[in-house]
Amino acid sequence: MPGTLAEISWKKSAPSALVDAVNAGDDADLGRAVRKFGLPEVGRASSRSVASMWQPLWSQSGFESTPRSDAMVELLARLGKAGRKPGRKALLELADSVAEHLADYEESSPDPFELLGWLTILAYCQALPAELLGRLWRDAAGWSLPILDGSVAEEAIVLSADQRVLVDGELPYVCGRLFSGLRGARRCAARGAKVLRKELKRSCDIDGTPHARLLERLPLWLAPFVRTAGLARATGEDWLDKAGRTRFRNVVERCAALCRSNGETALSNGAVCAPVSLLKTACDVAGLETGHAAVRFLASIGDDDERLVRNGGSSRSNKRMPLGPGRRSASPPTKKKDRPASQSDESQMACLRNNWGVGEDSCVVAFDGTMPRIDLAAFGVPWASGDWVTETRINGQLVPVTNEWRCCCWCSDSDADYAELETQLSDDVTLLRQVLLSRADHFVLLVDIVQSKSPETTGLQHTMSIPLVDGIEPAQDAVTREWAITVGRLRLRVFPLGLEQESVDRADGSLVVTNDAIELAQQTSDNGLVCPLFLDFSPARRKKGVAWSGVTIAEDGRTLPASEASGRRLRIGDHQWLYLHNLTRSEMGRTALGLHTFYETVIGEITARGEIEPVMQVES
């Protein structure tokens, strides 16, 4: 029978009053003994953290929904409304609901999410009526015995990373802390803490960047760490050493940078409950000061915990209205330590973000699979998210992506964030991807560069596709190859710089925008192809005239063909930019628009005097 203590084993140091109450079988006496001797004293929760009763709700979508788990969600929601640490009066009013729901477990044990809920109630609702508290302690201890003695049966199902952290890390730690009088409790808590520490090291780099494989369910993965840190602080325990605390703090900061102004995290599946309240609480328990940029950013978004409860725990119905360009980002910081951008080879992810302000411009790229994933937002409004698909054909034959991607260049400075990804399509063919996000000028540049070293290459076709979010409305310009996409109040202009501007002019490729994707296709008879796509979302340039064209690149008086170098010039209103990429190397400098350079790639702004001010320069 679940919840019985027939095989209970006590520590020699266990309080005799607690042991006698359990043996006597009187729940009221047991409840009084538990309140006095059987549970750790829990301190008052910080005002920066969400109510303790609501914290298990962060993980509800991590497990299969059942009538019992739905009832647990409702119960936790009601308890959370009673305060951060519900008092005796509030718990007396809710006691019947707790008892009624507890009766549903007389025949079978709870699943991990439900057990987490009951343990949370036991830890933070010690003011329950004595008889009910005793009954809850008895049942919860019975359910926890297999965890305490390490005899939990291995199930055939494969747990996701977030489920594994909760089941193998958080639950053993919580059980060990709450049932400290039982034999094996200390080892159990230590075992759980060890799992959590190892998972932090295994799934994050030394700077705290979580691995790209976690992004889809990142808040679900983070939640057990946050709750564990909160319980450890509330009970005066320490589950991390100094290095672990630093890593956890860094993880929280990196996760906050992945949060958009609409309250969702980049590349997530959207099913996570109240990620903003999770991240705010994470900042609190990780020790980020109130003046920290990440804390200020999250505070400016607004709370989602109340909305979570009102909507029955579904964050899909909690989405905020997009901010749009009406609310500008804060002035971009100049100090490197204040910039939220980061890149990690180990975690296979790059986070490009212009600042910590609400209404951020951001681009997150994950390169842990055969196709990189990309997530783009402008002024806090997400407009692209999903697989950044590519297709390359050499002499008409498809060359699939089969090798891993690596980040071969990363830079974050006062002008922009920049990343390069590279993969070998074959022994002779290389695909290079460039991403540049402007710090203050509100544009992003995406470039695919394909090169073949084979002299037999006579035809090269390449297509890249950028996945758009739901609700996109595309529109094609009447006379040029410019497209515009609109989502809410946000409008982006899309310029295929590698194609001729005028629609009536012949072009070796096409740009097509649908409700689902931006697809750029280009082709050449050479062995190298550069495919630049410039996306502008500046409100000031929304209706400005535009012109783009190729530029002449010379070396020692010789004009270079497209197989050796590619240069494009773009003008929008009074703003002009140059993009230059050298497909071949040379010990001599090359010249374009008066700029003499030895760099492989140059992205620069053309001033009113015709001078080139580099935004990004990349060595070969």
What are these regions (language model features)?
Residues 489-519:
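Active-site/ligand-binding surface loops and adjacent short beta/alpha elements
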Residues 38-252:
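Aromatic-lined, polymer-binding surfaces characteristic
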Residues 538-620:
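Non-catalytic terminal regions with compositionally biased, polar/charged low complexity
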